[in-house]
Amino acid sequence: DKACEQYFQDQLTIHYPDHDMLGEETGIHEKGSDYCWVIDPLDGTTNFSQGLPIFCVSTGLQYKKETIIGVVYAPYLNELYTTIKGEGAYRNGQKLKVSDKTELSRSVIATGFPYDHGTNPDHNSANIVHILPKVRGIRRMGSAAYDLCCVAAGNLDGYWELNLNLWDVCAGILLVE
């Protein structure tokens, strides 16, 4: 995680030396810019460490705290998700469309749990008990960024999770919008 984030920061500093950066591993690096790169170098760390294929690199660019560009790359799956605000979302160059389902009972949705679920009292388990009977199914992928990509592509009808940080969802939310 740390080496990957440092690489991103080094490259962004070369090309955009005045831009702010927010990274999962190193926090905020403020330079007083209206632009801020939001970086999650490895979303789905547990999946990666266990040899599971769902993990991503997620990067968003914000202008005055509004996300204007989002990029999520799932390297093992060779899926590149890209979006520019107002121009649609794409997977490997193919335009994406969110699901058109309007009934919760027909929906397959995803969720997640915080990495510290054993000590975090707000760990989402109680919500699943209430929601499961109302939906067609619930999935847990292990990467918030990838879950949002699946919503953007219409593979999932929705997604919720508690206690997320900006780097977890910055690019993915714009893909869905």
Where in the sequence are the language-model features?
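DPxDG-like acidic metal-binding loop motif
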Residues: 31-90
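An extended, acidic
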Residues: 97-177
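Generic detector of well-ordered alpha-helical packing
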Residues: 2, 25, 41-44, 48, ...
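Short, solvent-exposed loop/turn motifs
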Residues: 67, 95-97
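N-terminal subdomain of lithium-sensitive/metallo-dependent phosphomonoesterases centered on the IMPase/IPPase/PAP
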Residues: 1-42
